C-alpha cells in the first residue's frame, strides 16, 4: 500500500525561498536515500505568500515510518525560518496520474 506525507510549512515573511532551498536540498539528498522512497511534489501556494506544501510518497507504512527521522531533522533545520510547526498529515494513496 503506497502512502504519503503531506507537510505544510508556513514561513516567516521573506524566508520562504531560503526555507525551500534548505528543504529541497534535504529531499534531494537524505530523503531519496531512505528505502521505499517513491518521489515528491513541492508546491508554492498561490494564495498564501509564505506557504510551501510538500507531498512525499512512500512504498509502504514501513518506509514511511523509517523516513520519520529524516523528516524530523529537516523540520529542526528550518524551525528558525518558520512561524510555527508544520502541519503534517499521513495519507493512503489511491491513484497517481500525471499526463505528459
Language-model segment annotations:
Residues 1-4, 9, 38-53, 76-100:
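Glycine-rich beta-strand-turn "strand-cap" elements at beta-sheet edges
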Residues 8-13, 56-60:
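Short beta-strand-to-loop capping motifs
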Residues 15-17, 62-64, 96:
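Residue-level signal for secondary-structure boundary sites
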Residues 21, 52, 72-73:
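Residues in and immediately flanking transmembrane alpha helices
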